[in-house]
């Protein structure tokens, strides 16, 4: 994938206020379950899960399954643009 395509995908994923809030919470908390994230952003579990799927597809978050719960954290290789934006939250 070209750098321009990747940047476009990243910017589209972060352009949504709810997804941006998810990234901001993950920056502070390091790792959260879908349920914990949905409580933080006042959104249903299902909608939160959908937003997390989009962030995962854009390589902005990583997930780990432990027992019956999925834990999300910021990706290790975040795009420099996202890192710069997250410095200000």
Language model features with spans:
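Conserved segment of winged-helix/HTH DNA-binding domains
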Residues: 2, 28, 69-89
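Short capping segments at the starts of secondary-structure elements
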Residues: 17-20, 29-33
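A short acidic, leucine-rich amphipathic alpha-helix
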Residues: 36-38
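Key DNA-contact positions within bacterial/archaeal DNA-binding proteins
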Residues: 46
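Short, hydrophobic-biased segments on the C-terminal half of alpha helices
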Residues: 52-53
């Amino acid at each position: 994938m070209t750098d321009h395509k990747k940047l476009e995908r990243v910017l589209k994923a972060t352009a949504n206020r709810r997804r941006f809030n998810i990234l901001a919470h993950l920056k502070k908390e390091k790792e959260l379950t879908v349920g914990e994230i949905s409580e933080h952003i006042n959104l249903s579990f299902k909608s939160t899960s959908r937003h997390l799927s989009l962030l995962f597809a854009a390589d902005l978050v990583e997930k780990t399954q432990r027992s019956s719960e999925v834990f999300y954290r910021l990706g290790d290789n975040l795009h420099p643009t996202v890192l710069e934006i997250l410095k200000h939250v």
